[in-house]
Each structure stands twice: as C-alpha cells, then as structure tokens.
C-alpha cells in the first residue's frame, strides 16, 4: 500500500490548504474518471489495469517466452515513454547490473533514445556473435532516433539470419492501423503489438510498450498489473483521506503556489534511477507548458548528498523534495567487526546496512526540513512487482490531477515539436527548405 506522509511540509503551508485545494481536486478527478477534460481522449490509461486487452496480453507473454528461448539479447528500440518505463521497472526489480548477472533471461539493450554514433556502435558490437531479437517501439515509425536505429538493427538481423528469420525476430509495438512502422511490419510479417490511440507514450508503461521487454526480463507482469489495478481502485476514491494521489497532487500544487518551483525526487536505492528518469518525463511533459509547472529533478541518496546535498541544504529556497522509501531489503548485510578499528567504525559492527540507511534517511530528512526544504514522503512498503505496479499508477494518476490543477492539458507536448522542426530543416528534410535558409543564417553557416 502506497502511503503519502505530509507531516514534513505542514510548517511551510498556509493552513488549512486541504479545504482550498479539494474542490479543484474534485474537478480534476472527475475529468480523469470521465475523460471529459482537456486531452480527455488520452485518458485510456486511467482504467487500463482493469480493461486491458486480455488476448494481446497473452500474446505478450508468449512473445516474451519465445525471446527467452531463442535469444541471448533483446534490443529495445524506442525513445522517451517508449523505453523509460520498461528500463525503470527492469532496473528497479532486477538490478541496474541486470545484463551482468547470471540469469536465464536475455540481456536487454536500450537503443534509439539518442543520436550518438558511439552508443549505436557499442550496441551493435554487444550483439556480435549473439542470437538476438529486436523490439522496435514507435507509434508512427517516423520518430528520427528510433527509426534510424531500427534501420541499422534490421539490416544487421537480415544479414545474419536472412529476411525470413529476421522477420521472426522483430517485434513491432506501434499503431493498430496506420503509420510507417505498421506498414513495414505488415509488409514483412513482423509480429505487432499496439500502442493504444487513447494512451500517450509517457503513460504507456503498462501497455505492450513496457510489458513486452519487462516480461522478457522475467518479471511477473501479472503481479505488476494486479498492483496497478489495486491502486486504480484506491485512486477512484474522491477525497484526500483515502486517495494518496489526491494528497500528493494537492501538496505539490500548494507548494508550487508558495514559490517552490522545483521538485526533487529522491530515493536511497540505486536501482530506482531510471524510475526517476521515467517520473521526470511524466511530470515534465505533462505540467511544463503555458509558462507553468514544477521543474522535475532527481537525486540518488546517499551518493548525491556528497554533490547536490550542499545546494539542497543551503541553496535557494525554491525547491521541495519527494522521497520514495522502500521497506527492508531481502538481503540483510551486517557490518563486520574489525580488530584494528582503523576506520573507527566498530560502533557500526553487527548493524545491518538497512538500519544504517534508515538512520541516514531520517537524519537527512531532519536536516533538510530544518534547512527550509519541505519533504513529502512516499512509503511503498516493499520493492516487488505488485508494489511497483501500484507506484507507477499512483504517479500517473497524481500527474493527471496535477496537470488539471494547473489548468493545462496533461496529455500533450506541443513544445517538443520546436526542436524537431529545426532539426528536420537542418538535415534537409523535404518541405523544410524555407526554414532551413532562416536557420542557416542564424547559425552563421
């Protein structure tokens, strides 16, 4: 069960803020439940954990088993919401060192999320002499980064296996009916999975977009979905007391309007790093428009206490922290006793790393709050697939609420098009000739 502890923000708020924000939350909640707010056509994720396509879900499981049986590596090609959620779940539940561990599942390499020649070359070298499959994820099939990467890996597969066997090793997650990737998949006989029309990329981790690579990594997607459904039912409640997403969204909204413009997501587990990257895209793209929105950042404690800790403690007071806390680790490592005690740490001998970490958490919390930084605590209880499914849904629902509280569309991202237009023009894409001339002059080329 996800719990949101707001006790460490109360002294920073105008009280009682709940009475002021609850009517707005009620409206936002209704928009999500009924799909009748701005961007309501993209709220398919709200009831997805209950209403997902069971037939496709079984095909996802079957494809994952096939990949596990015939491939030592799976190359996942996608950018943004097409890969961050899957990578976040895999690293959180398996390990950031997943590819280095002994296992009966394939290594998973994420590519097509940038334009680095070095990263592309390295990924191609990693599958040399290794049986591999490809999961290419793109609704349109024309997004530059994944489309370019797919050209390279499709060619690599076809050279190694021939076109027929290569086709059996390519899984395309794309639009159900149209688009360049769908057409290519139909023409070549790739197995396809659907990016739903009513779910945007950053909300799609619990669709085939995330579930196929997650299942290929051996993670129990039944547990992931059941956790999400449990949280969906919890988030259907229309009040702050019963709905943790209301509490989180309401607190963020109030802190934002009190001048706290930056939210730092913190966790004490290195495995949470890419879940934080997913969270940053989720909130950054959903809220950051019309000159509004919190700036989402993330830190990994305790490592970043030795870098960002100084700023958080004594820098500009325009931020707050949201700290994700997991329950006890399954691995209870105890500090050994050292006869010489040269490091002076024998006072820790016999104590578990979990115990030490908890004292670091509590000490940091007190220091930051006393230093003028409000802290929201999100308690997860445990770190397993069921809990993580609930955490994903919790963050998604709170994000939808947050967008509506700010009176923006939480489901579009019009600002992303600006760089794309310039990039296409500079690359010489047909139809961008006039813009290219303007940009070349500005760049002084």
What are these regions (language model features)?
Residues 1-65, 339-347, 435-445:
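Extended, charge-enriched "interface" segments that sit outside catalytic cores
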Residues 59-72, 123-131, 252-261, 312-317:
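Glycine-rich phosphate/diphosphate-binding loops that line cofactor/substrate pockets in enzymes
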Residues 65-238, 425:
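Glycine-rich phosphate-binding loops that contact phosphosugars or nucleotide phosphates
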Residues 91-94, 124-127, 151-153, 186-188, ...:
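Short, solvent-exposed amphipathic alpha-helical segments in soluble enzyme
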Residues 138-143, 213-219, 271, 328-330, ...:
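A generic structural motif
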Residues 160-322, 327-330, 415-445:
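Active-site phosphate/pyrophosphate-binding segments
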Residues 297-384:
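Helicase-primase coupling helices
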Residues 376-378, 382-445:
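C-terminal helical/tail subdomains of lipid-metabolizing enzymes
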């Amino acid at each position: 069960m996800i719990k949101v502890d707001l006790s460490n923000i109360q002294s920073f708020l105008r009280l009682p803020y709940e009475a002021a924000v609850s009517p707005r939350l009620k409206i936002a909640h209704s928009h999500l439940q009924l799909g009748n707010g701005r961007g309501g056509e993209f709220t398919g994720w709200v009831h997805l954990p209950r209403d997902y396509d069971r037939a496709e879900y079984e095909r996802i499981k079957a494809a994952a088993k096939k990949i596990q049986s015939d491939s030592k590596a799976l190359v996942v090609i996608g950018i943004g919401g097409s890969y961050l959620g899957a990578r976040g779940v895999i690293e959180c539940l398996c390990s950031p060192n997943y590819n280095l561990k002994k296992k009966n599942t394939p290594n998973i390499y994420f590519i097509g999320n940038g334009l680095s020649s070095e990263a592309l070359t390295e990924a191609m070298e990693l599958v040399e002499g290794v049986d591999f499959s490809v999961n290419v994820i793109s609704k349109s099939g024309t997004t530059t980064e994944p489309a370019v990467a797919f050209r390279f890996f499709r060619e690599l597969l076809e050279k190694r296996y021939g076109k027929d066997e290569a086709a059996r090793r390519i899984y395309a997650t794309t639009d159900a009916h149209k688009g360049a990737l769908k057409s290519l998949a139909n023409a070549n006989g790739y197995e396809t999975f659907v990016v739903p029309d009513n779910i945007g990329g950053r909300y799609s981790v619990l669709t085939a977009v995330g579930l196929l690579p997650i299942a290929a990594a051996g993670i129990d997607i039944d547990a992931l979905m059941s956790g999400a459904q449990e949280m969906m039912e919890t988030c259907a409640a229309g009040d702050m007391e019963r709905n943790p997403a209301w509490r989180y969204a309401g607190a963020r909204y109030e802190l934002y309007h009190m001048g706290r413009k930056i939210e730092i997501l913190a966790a004490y587990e290195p495995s949470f790093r890419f879940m934080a990257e997913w969270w940053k895209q989720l909130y950054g793209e959903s809220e950051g428009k019309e000159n509004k929105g919190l700036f989402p950042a993330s830190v990994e404690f305790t490592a970043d206490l030795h870098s960002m800790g100084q700023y958080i403690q004594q820098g500009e007071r325009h931020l707050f922290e949201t700290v994700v806390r997991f329950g006890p680790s399954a691995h209870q490592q105890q500090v050994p006793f050292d006869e010489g005690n040269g490091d002076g740490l024998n006072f820790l001998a016999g104590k578990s790393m979990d115990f030490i970490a908890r004292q670091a958490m509590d000490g940091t919390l007190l220091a930051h709050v006393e230093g003028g930084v409000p802290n929201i605590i999100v308690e997860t209880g445990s770190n397993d697939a069921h809990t993580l499914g609930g955490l994903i849904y919790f963050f998604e629902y709170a994000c939808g609420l947050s967008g509506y509280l700010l009176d923006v569309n939480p489901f579009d991202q019009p600002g992303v098009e600006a760089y794309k237009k310039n990039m296409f023009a500079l690359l010489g894409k047909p139809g961008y000739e006039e813009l290219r001339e303007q940009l070349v002059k500005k760049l002084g080329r």
